[in-house]
């Protein structure tokens, strides 16, 4: 009984700390409103940055390895989750190879996910103990400070030599990278290249953002101990990384060694980085507001892709305003049965009619694997791609990054990529009926999933702002 009492007290302390700290959702400040009104995405000048969207998981892995292999001075990698599965080991091997060449590596990982995937892991110790590598964790998991627990870093990007980068929604493991057996998530990234960056270019915006979050007090070092390299398990892990990476490199050598991106990228007029605050508390919804204003000013079309929809009244109101101004306003998300997130699935099932009432057209993806893409298509010249989900967690709790790209070529590429998924979706109508122009076979909603949804809705629905 004593142990049970202690457990209940600790659980109550954790729950109370989390709920009190994150219950209040800040409003948009006048400063943000003013900055958004004068948004730099409206400024067009001669831009030297070129870009291309990365749609497929195997290509996403190869392009990351390519950036790392050809880096000469510095590599920056920031990711929400990093696992030591097949694709994760290939990235670790590529980073270790770069460090051996004298390239300075800085790796930043979310402190909750790293506690699960990296602690006690010799593959990560093999990298952290290298003299040319620094690894930091954002907001390390600390049960004694539950009021900081939900502030997570959701960013995903890789920068090479301050000239080229990949940014998007993919984490660093098999679900998102490569083509390995097992579960998959579909997502997208943007590759941006600029051989001679100007001060206002997005690569410099991203580098400055990284320096700010890297140097803030909530980012602390991960096992910065060079003696770890002497452990037998670490030595064996490093050898395995080197062998697996070398095999992958030899199989893809021609493409990895190609350093001219001109023929595979498109010109852009402007690329702008949009970001949330980086502290660990409840955040001002900067990204939500700025994206909302962008969409309100569309001339005739807004198309959103998101894995989850968990909104409050402020967010619903934003969509109502967009629907009043834009004739073609739609969103595609996972169906209840196809959603890999039980919280997102349960909330969508409960609030689907409320979403429809805003005036937005909803398409439900039925592709079998959970769709994880986070993108917005605006008219025929604006594309928005990054890590931001259409939910309260992305709006108020997590660090998030989205790229606003002004380019008709990128817009066309994004439209084609979106359409590939929409052809495996159905439009939900009021009353629960469907418009099914593509004759899609829906995923079965199993009894087991129905029970999960019921439990989440009735036991955890009050905490929907945390999921």
Label each residue range with its predicted role.
Residues 1-133, 143-154, 160, 164-467:
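Charged, low-complexity intrinsically disordered terminal segments
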Residues 136:
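Extended, Lys/Arg-enriched charged tracts that mediate electrostatic binding to polyanionic substrates
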């Amino acid at each position: 009984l004593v142990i049970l009492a202690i457990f209940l007290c600790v659980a109550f302390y954790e729950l109370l700390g989390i709920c009190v700290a994150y219950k209040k959702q800040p409003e948009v400040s006048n400063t943000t409103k003013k900055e958004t009104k004068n948004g730099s995405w409206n400024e067009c000048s001669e831009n030297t940055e070129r870009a291309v969207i990365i749609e497929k998981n195997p290509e996403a892995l190869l392009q990351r390895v390519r950036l790392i292999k050809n880096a000469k001075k510095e590599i920056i990698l920031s990711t929400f989750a990093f696992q030591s599965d097949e694709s994760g080991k290939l990235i670790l091997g590529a980073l270790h190879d770069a460090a051996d060449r004298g390239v300075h590596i800085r790796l930043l990982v979310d402190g909750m996910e790293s506690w699960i995937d990296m602690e006690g892991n010799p593959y990560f110790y093999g990298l952290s103990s290298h003299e040319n590598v620094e690894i930091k964790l954002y907001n390390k998991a600390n049960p004694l400070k539950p009021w900081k627990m939900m502030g997570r870093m959701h960013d995903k990007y890789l920068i090479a030599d301050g000239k080229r980068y990949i940014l998007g929604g993919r984490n660093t493991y098999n679900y998102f990278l490569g083509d390995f057996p097992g579960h998959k998530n579909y997502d997208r990234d943007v590759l941006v290249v600029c051989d001679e960056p100007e001060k206002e270019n997005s690569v410099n915006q991203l580098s400055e953002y990284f320096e700010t979050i890297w140097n803030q007090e909530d980012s602390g070092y991960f096992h910065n101990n060079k003696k770890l390299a002497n452990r037998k398990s670490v030595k064996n892990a490093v050898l395995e990384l080197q062998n697996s990476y070398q095999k992958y490199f030899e199989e893809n050598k021609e493409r990895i060694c190609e350093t001219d991106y001109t023929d595979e990228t498109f010109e852009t007029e402007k690329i702008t980085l949009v970001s949330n605050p980086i502290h660990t508390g409840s955040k001002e919804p900067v990204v939500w507001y700025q994206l909302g204003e962008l969409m309100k000013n569309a001339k005739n079309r807004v198309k959103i892709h998101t894995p989850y929809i968990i909104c409050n009244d402020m967010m619903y109101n934003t969509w109502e305003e967009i629907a009043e101004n834009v004739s073609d306003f739609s969103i595609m998300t996972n169906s209840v049965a196809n959603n890999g997130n039980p919280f997102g699935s349960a909330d969508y099932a409960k609030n689907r009619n409320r979403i429809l009432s805003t005036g937005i057209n909803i398409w439900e993806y039925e592709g079998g694997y959970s769709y994880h893409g986070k993108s917005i298509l605006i008219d025929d010249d604006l594309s928005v791609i990054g890590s931001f989900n259409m939910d309260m967690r992305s709006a108020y709790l997590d660090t998030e990054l989205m790229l606003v790209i002004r380019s008709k070529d990128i817009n066309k590429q994004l439209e084609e990529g979106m359409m590939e998924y929409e052809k495996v979706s159905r439009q939900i109508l009021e009353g629960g009926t469907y418009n099914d122009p593509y004759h899609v076979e829906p995923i079965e909603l199993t009894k087991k999933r129905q029970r999960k949804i019921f439990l989440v809705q009735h036991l955890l629905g009050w905490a929907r702002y945390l999921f």
